[in-house]
């Protein structure tokens, strides 16, 4: 039941962000093989994230949407945007920059969760590696197309969790936000992969 409530919250967040997921113009000059690989990676990360979410919910009982909303405000976790991916006139460079920057943000947030619990560490490590791999692939493609900025983006300010409870609550929130971000990213990549 708690997992269903969490999934409902994720869908609510995704629906709230739907204006950002408006149809894109067909302006993609990205290789099909790159797009298909990214789609596969996003689905793998989503599966890893769902597994970690279930374990966090089962282990720490922090899955009620009301708790998540309150905790989200108190922890002040940053969220990634894909606004350059949603305009009627797609900004491919801006979209790829935002995809990459969002993944870098979530890399940092996942790193901040280190030490959440010994049982969850392997699942967290896998999720972090998969996010890093996707971010690297996007960056390399941007370099190949000469779209990459002069320097790699930084992770920015990552919250410091001062207690085990905050780290566990942050884990639930970070994974939830990552799942919402990935759902939008998947829609963008799927659209770009269409002939």
Swiss-Prot record:
SUPFAM superfamilies in the record: 4-helical cytokines (SSF47266)
Sugar attachment sites: 154
Localization in the cell: Secreted
Pfam families: GCSF
Post-translational modification: O-glycosylated.
Domain of life, source organism: Eukaryota
Disulfide pattern: 57-63, 85-95
Signal peptide: 1-21
Sorted UniProt keywords: Cytokine, Disulfide bond, Glycoprotein, Growth factor, Secreted, Signal
Presence of the UniProt keyword Signal in the record: yes
GO BP: any one term: positive regulation of myeloid cell differentiation
GO cellular component: extracellular space
MF terms in GO: cytokine activity; granulocyte colony-stimulating factor receptor binding; growth factor activity
Any coiled-coil regions, as ranges: none
InterPro entries the UniProt entry points to: 4_helix_cytokine-like_core, GCSF/MGF, IL-6/GCSF/MGF, IL6/GCSF/MGF_CS
UniProt xrefs under PROSITE patterns: INTERLEUKIN_6 (PS00254)
Assembly and interaction partners: Monomer.
Family: Belongs to the IL-6 superfamily.
Its job: Granulocyte/macrophage colony-stimulating factors are cytokines that act in hematopoiesis by controlling the production, differentiation, and function of 2 related white cell populations of the blood, the granulocytes and the monocytes-macrophages. This CSF induces granulocytes.
Protein name per the record: Granulocyte colony-stimulating factor
Species the sequence originates in: Sus scrofa
Organismal lineage: Eukaryota, Metazoa, Chordata, Craniata, Vertebrata
């Amino acid at each position: 039941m708690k997992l269903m409530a969490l999934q409902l919250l994720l869908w609510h967040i995704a629906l709230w962000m739907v204006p950002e997921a408006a149809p894109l113009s067909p302006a993609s000059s990205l290789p099909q093989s790159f797009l298909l690989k990214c789609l596969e990676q996003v689905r793998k990360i989503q599966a890893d994230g769902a597994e970690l979410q279930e374990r966090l919910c089962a282990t720490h009982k922090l899955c009620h949407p009301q708790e998540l909303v309150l905790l989200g405000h108190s922890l002040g976790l940053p969220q990634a945007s894909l606004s350059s991916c949603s305009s009627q006139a797609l900004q491919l460079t801006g979209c790829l920059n935002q995809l990459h920057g969002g993944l870098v943000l979530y890399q940092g947030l996942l790193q901040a969760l280190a030490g959440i619990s010994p049982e969850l560490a392997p699942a967290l490590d896998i999720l972090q590696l998969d996010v890093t791999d996707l971010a690297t692939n996007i960056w390399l493609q941007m370099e190949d197309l000469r779209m990459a900025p002069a320097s790699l983006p930084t992770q920015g300010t990552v919250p410091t969790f001062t207690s085990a409870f905050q780290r566990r609550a942050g884990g639930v929130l970070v994974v939830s936000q990552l799942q919402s971000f990935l759902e939008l990213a998947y829609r963008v990549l799927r659209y770009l992969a269409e002939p």
